[in-house]
């Protein structure tokens, strides 16, 4: 994907706010469905970004990662949950946590399908190679290629961002959502100590990921980037295959 210009970054910011809102609203919605009305009573079952944004996690963190040359991720204001309202406390807590990253994976699919629709309707112009001796060769835009306009760029950025948010939040370390799966599997006598690690905060995770870059003594960042690259590449192959089938000839 080629460098992003000013308009591209504006679109990226809007997509980021939308994605974080969907992520946090998914937590709140599932918690409410499982019997905990806390988030709903506080107005968190909504896609309104103003209800979910956090000054550090939603703004300063993504900017800091960008200037540090690291993958851009972010977060919203944590959704308040009272596990005492759940019938199956550990299991339901895990399901609420997984709702966030799975909502981002759903958005990955949405952006991929929007790319197909944009290609099919001509919003993303195909590359036409003129052939003076026969029919012109029409090549439709590739999800894995360079963007020809801002619509294409925004759709690719949306898919990449949400894939990154999903994978990052599934890292099984507190306070990320993936740690709730580990907590569910742990004996009840250890669960409290495991969840107490949440107090160390997201910046410990970022520190571990930064130290995990190649040549810095670890592999956490390397594995994250490889998973992100693998996921985006295979998404691109699937989207391009669908475009090739449904796009008009």
Residue ranges and their predicted role:
Residues 1-249:
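Hydrophobic transmembrane alpha-helices and their immediate loop junctions
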């Amino acid at each position: 994907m080629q460098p992003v210009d000013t308009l591209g970054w504006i679109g990226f910011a809007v997509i980021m706010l939308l994605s974080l809102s969907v992520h946090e609203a998914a937590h709140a919605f599932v918690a409410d469905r499982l019997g905990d009305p806390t988030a709903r009573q506080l107005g968190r079952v909504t896609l309104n970004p103003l209800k979910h944004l956090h000054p550090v996690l939603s703004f300063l963190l993504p900017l800091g990662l960008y200037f540090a040359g690291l993958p851009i991720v972010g977060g919203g204001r944590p959704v308040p949950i009272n596990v005492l309202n759940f019938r199956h406390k550990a299991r339901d807590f895990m399901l609420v946590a997984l709702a966030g990253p799975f909502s981002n994976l759903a958005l990955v699919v949405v952006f991929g399908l929007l790319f197909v629709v944009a290609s099919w309707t001509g919003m993303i112009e195909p590359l036409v190679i003129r052939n003076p001796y026969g029919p012109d060769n029409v090549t439709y835009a590739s999800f894995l290629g360079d963007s020809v306009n801002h619509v294409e760029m925004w759709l690719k950025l949306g898919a990449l961002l949400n894939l990154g948010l999903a994978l990052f939040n599934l890292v099984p370390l507190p306070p990320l959502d993936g740690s709730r799966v580990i907590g569910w599997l742990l004996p009840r006598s250890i669960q409290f100590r495991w969840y107490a690690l949440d107090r160390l905060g997201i910046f410990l995770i970022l520190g571990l990921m930064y130290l995990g870059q190649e040549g810095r003594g670890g592999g956490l960042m390397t594995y994250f980037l490889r998973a992100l690259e693998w996921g985006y590449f295979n998404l691109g192959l699937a989207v391009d295959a669908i475009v090739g089938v449904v796009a008009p000839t």
